[in-house]
């Protein structure tokens, strides 16, 4: 099918032809810049015009033309803009031809003297302009812009050109990830990489993406967590490890979920759930300190990051809310209780699943300020250490902010006999219809048989953390290329 162009798109293509007839390339090799707009601002912003011109600084500046104001072109750099003053009387014939065919969105290289306008704005007095790249599609106009969310996500490369705040969000995302690494590196954690393709499903309760490994003639999973290989490294004597990487879960898409996302998981020998709470609160505080923030507006609420994070027991919170001590229930009575509270019961449900459902229904919505919820049921925590005072529950905790889960942490199970029993229970759940249940990872059981020291482990969703610190309400706002339904590319 032949592609149809708008009138403006056709005009730009005609300009390419006109330039080529003048032996001027519309798509050129680079010209090495001597400065960036950021460097020019840093070096000359606080100087007077006369003092700047005395330095006789000739700059070669590359950038995208995003505006034209009389004799001035505005070039967009990495994080700032700079004006180019165009005096046609001072320019050669080739430059004049380029200017005649120039459009907003074109990428140029401007050479000239660094100076300031009479109103004190930095500029370059152009002595030469070269065309580096002709833009064939007009940018959205500055009045209407690119405002439709799906259009913005689908054409992120345009979004970051015309919406400066969006670009700043992703620059901040990169900075936050660097700060996370800095925090754990300072604590002598070792960053590692583990396989994305896994032969066994495990490490989290999630539905996987499945692929076929031709060379091995079998199905593999895109990892749903990095937990099991990282704990194998703890067995191997590394003691403190972390991994920042992509995770894949074949599940729904909403404001806080994307099938492909980034997580950090970290594991520390001779620690536990309480130590992981300390590390998790520590990384949040470290980021806040480095970004110089104390309070954030997130999901319509003001969150004070300087106060100690609260801690509540999941089972106690549910019992208090519904007026029933759920610790005293068996599976049968728990299922009866679920029906009383209009909770949909699955075939594999036990006491722990009911407690989790009651928590999600009644307690989650009350968790606004940063709160650790601990003491999860064993039924929903197959990799966590049992609570010694009541083995139906575990040393597991989650961090909630504004009703959303941000982190999941355990005192890790290091008993190979117990771990195998839990894997077998998970297999029973899988056979009963729970698609998120784990399989038996025999190699992990074998690793535990060699001996894993008492260990604390935690996973944090990077996107949710970045949503929090950038005060965004949707995960798509912090993913450069979020998943969207396919549309025609014509």
From Swiss-Prot:
Give the cofactors, semicolon-separated.
Mg(2+)
Q: What class of enzyme is it?
A: ligase
**Annotated positions binding Mg(2+) 2:** 405
Q: What biological processes does GO assign it?
A: lysyl-tRNA aminoacylation
Q: Which Pfam families match?
A: tRNA-synt_2, tRNA_anti-codon
Q: Which UniProt keywords apply?
A: Aminoacyl-tRNA synthetase, ATP-binding, Cytoplasm, Ligase, Magnesium, Metal-binding, Nucleotide-binding, Protein biosynthesis
Reactions catalysed: tRNA(Lys) + L-lysine + ATP = L-lysyl-tRNA(Lys) + AMP + diphosphate
Which residues are involved in binding Mg(2+) 1? 398, 405
Q: Which GO terms describe its molecular function?
A: ATP binding; lysine-tRNA ligase activity; magnesium ion binding; tRNA binding
According to its UniProt record, where is this protein mainly located? cytoplasm
InterPro entries given in the database record: Aa-tRNA-synt_II (IPR004364), aa-tRNA-synth_II (IPR006195), aa-tRNA-synth_II/BPL/LPL (IPR045864), Lys-tRNA-ligase_II (IPR002313), Lys-tRNA-ligase_II_N (IPR044136), Lys-tRNA-synth_II_C (IPR018149), NA-bd_OB-fold (IPR012340), NA-bd_OB_tRNA (IPR004365)
Q: How is the cofactor bound?
A: Binds 3 Mg(2+) ions per subunit.
Q: What is its EC number?
A: 6.1.1.6
Localization recorded for this chain is:
Cytoplasm
One GO CC term of this entry?
cytosol
Is Cytoplasm given among the entry's keywords?
A: yes
Family membership: Belongs to the class-II aminoacyl-tRNA synthetase family.
Q: How does it assemble?
A: Homodimer.
Q: What is this protein called?
A: Lysine--tRNA ligase
Query: Top-down, what is the taxonomic lineage of the species of origin?
Result: Bacteria, Bacillati, Mycoplasmatota, Mycoplasmoidales, Metamycoplasmataceae
């Amino acid at each position: 099918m032949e592609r149809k162009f708008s009138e403006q798109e056709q005009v730009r293509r005609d300009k390419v032809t006109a330039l080529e007839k003048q032996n001027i390339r519309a798509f050129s090799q680079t010209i090495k810049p001597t400065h960036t707009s950021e460097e020019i601002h840093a070096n000359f912003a606080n100087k007077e015009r006369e003092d700047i011109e005395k330095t006789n600084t000739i700059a070669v500046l590359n950038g995208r033309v995003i505006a034209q104001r009389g004799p001035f072109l505005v070039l967009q750099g990495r994080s700032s803009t700079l004006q180019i003053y165009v005096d046609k009387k001072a320019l050669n014939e080739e430059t004049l031809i380029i200017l005649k065919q120039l459009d907003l969105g074109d990428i140029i290289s401007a050479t000239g003297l660094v100076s300031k306008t009479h109103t004190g704005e930095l500029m370059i007095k152009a002595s030469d302009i070269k065309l580096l790249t002709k833009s064939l599609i007009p940018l959205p106009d500055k009045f209407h812009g690119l405002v439709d969310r799906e259009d913005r996500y689908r054409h992120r490369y345009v979004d970051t050109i015309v919406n400066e705040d969006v670009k700043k969000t992703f620059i901040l995302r990169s900075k936050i990830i660097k700060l996370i690494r800095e925090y754990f590196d300072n604590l002598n954690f070792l960053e590692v990489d583990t396989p994305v393709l896994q032969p066994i499903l495990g490490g989290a309760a999630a539905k996987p993406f499945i692929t076929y490994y031709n060379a091995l003639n079998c199905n593999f999973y895109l990892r749903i967590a990095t937990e099991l290989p990282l704990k194998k490294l703890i067995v191997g004597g590394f003691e403190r490890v972390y991994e920042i990487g992509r995770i894949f879960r074949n599940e729904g898409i909403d404001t806080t979920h994307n099938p492909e996302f980034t997580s950090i998981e970290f594991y520390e020998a001779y620690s536990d759930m309480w130590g992981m709470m300390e590390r998790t609160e520590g990384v949040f505080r470290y980021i806040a300190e480095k970004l110089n923030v104390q309070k954030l507006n997130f999901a319509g609420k003001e969150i004070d990051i300087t106060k100690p994070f609260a801690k509540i027991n999941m089972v106690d919170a549910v019992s208090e809310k519904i007026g029933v001590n759920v610790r005293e229930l068996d599976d049968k009575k728990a299922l009866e209780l679920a029906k009383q509270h209009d909770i949909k019961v699955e075939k594999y449900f036990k006491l722990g699943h009911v407690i989790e459902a009651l928590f999600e229904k009644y307690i989650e919505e009350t968790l606004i300020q940063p709160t650790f919820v601990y003491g999860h049921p064993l039924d929903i925590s197959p990799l966590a250490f049992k609570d010694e005072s009541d083995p139906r529950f575990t040393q597991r905790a989650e961090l909630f902010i504004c009703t959303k889960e941000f982190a999941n942490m355990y005192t890790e199970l290091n008993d190979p006999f117990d771990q195998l029993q839990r894997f077998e229970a998970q297999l029973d759940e899988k056979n009963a219809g729970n698609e998120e249940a784990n399989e038996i990872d025999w190699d992990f059981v074998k690793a535990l048989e060699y001996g894993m020291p008492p260990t604390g482990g935690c996973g944090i969703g990077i996107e949710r953390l970045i949503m929090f610190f950038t005060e965004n309400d949707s995960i798509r706002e912090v993913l450069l290329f979020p998943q969207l339904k396919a549309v025609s590319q014509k």
